[in-house]
């Protein structure tokens, strides 16, 4: 084999590896995107496993930790595991249904000790299928809204 043939073979192999790596990076990016209510979000960070419950009716109309007025008709949640103001995806692993909710409140300390990761609104709990039993196992992960294109 001549020097030129070896060199061309080396360049071809390098370009093949670069192309394969680019294809793998594209697929990773695609799997990190989720859509909820026609808005795209990027999944960020580790998944937190735990239990979810939903707020009692007595909290309707009260102020949350962020100062917002609580409503069971919104996609919000309380959590002691995530910062206030961020969005998270909450998945019910039994049926793979999920919601995106904004963390705008804190839970009572006793709820965290019981393994609760989030306390959802009734709307969110119904959407992922934990409303009837009142509590359910969930996977929770931080998300960020994608910029409008």
Where are these regions (language model features)?
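Secreted/periplasmic proteins
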Residues: 2-7, 21-149
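Bacterial N-terminal signal peptides
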Residues: 8-16
């Amino acid at each position: 084999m001549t020097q030129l043939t070896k060199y061309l073979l080396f360049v071809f192999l390098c370009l093949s590896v670069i192309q394969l790596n680019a294809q793998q990076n594209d697929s990773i990016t695609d799997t990190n995107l989720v859509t909820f209510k026609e808005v795209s979000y990027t999944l960020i960070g580790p998944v937190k496993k735990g239990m979810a419950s939903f707020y009692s009716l007595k909290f309707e109309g009260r102020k949350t930790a962020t100062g917002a007025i609580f409503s069971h008709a919104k996609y919000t949640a309380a959590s002691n595991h995530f910062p206030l103001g961020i969005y998270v995806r909450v998945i019910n692993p039994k049926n793979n249904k999920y919601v995106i909710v904004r963390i705008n409140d804190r839970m009572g300390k006793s709820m965290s000790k019981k393994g609760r990761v989030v306390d959802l609104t009734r709307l969110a709990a119904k959407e992922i299928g934990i409303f009837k039993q009142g509590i359910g196992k969930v996977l929770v992960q931080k998300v960020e809204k994608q910029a409008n294109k």
